[in-house]
Amino acid sequence: MKTIDVKILDPRMQEQMPAYATSGSAGLDLRACIEAPITIKPGETHLIPTGLAIHIGNPAYAAVILPRSGMGHKHGIVLGNLVGLIDSDYQGQLMVSTWNRGQAEFVLNPMERLAQLVIVPVLQVGFNIVDDFDSSERGAGGFGSTGKH
């Protein structure tokens, strides 16, 4: 298993380190490291600290912060930036941009699981400037061009 460096910024995280829930889990839960409950009104966004900083250190990897499916489906709580991208050379605290897209207020409690962190491979590429592309089956067809069903 690949390891990355983590710095615990909030002592409460000593007992709440992210862990894979099952052997098939892709994401590690991130928690809201807040001192008191926060009420997030419909349409509001809040930047929530996680109490952790990571340093991946290897440009062949990055991390993405994704919403937890239950939070979005049941409560309308999703990420304000939709997906958070953490570059391999970032060393600051992981923060979760939290947006209430629902119709009701949501109370976020201290240490509540809020989002998930997924480590992904990255391929850095260069560009080869061309005048034209070799033809492909799809061509330049965009949104909806491959059919409805």
From Swiss-Prot:
The keyword Magnesium applies. It comes from Herminiimonas arsenicoxydans. Pfam families: dUTPase (PF00692). Keywords: Hydrolase, Magnesium, Metal-binding, Nucleotide metabolism. This is Deoxyuridine 5'-triphosphate nucleotidohydrolase. It comes from the Bacteria. Disulfide bonds: none annotated. PANTHER family: DEOXYURIDINE 5'-TRIPHOSPHATE NUCLEOTIDOHYDROLASE. This enzyme is involved in nucleotide metabolism: it produces dUMP, the immediate precursor of thymidine nucleotides and it decreases the intracellular concentration of dUTP so that uracil cannot be incorporated into DNA. Its cofactor is Mg(2+). GO terms for molecular function: dUTP diphosphatase activity; magnesium ion binding. Belongs to the dUTPase family.
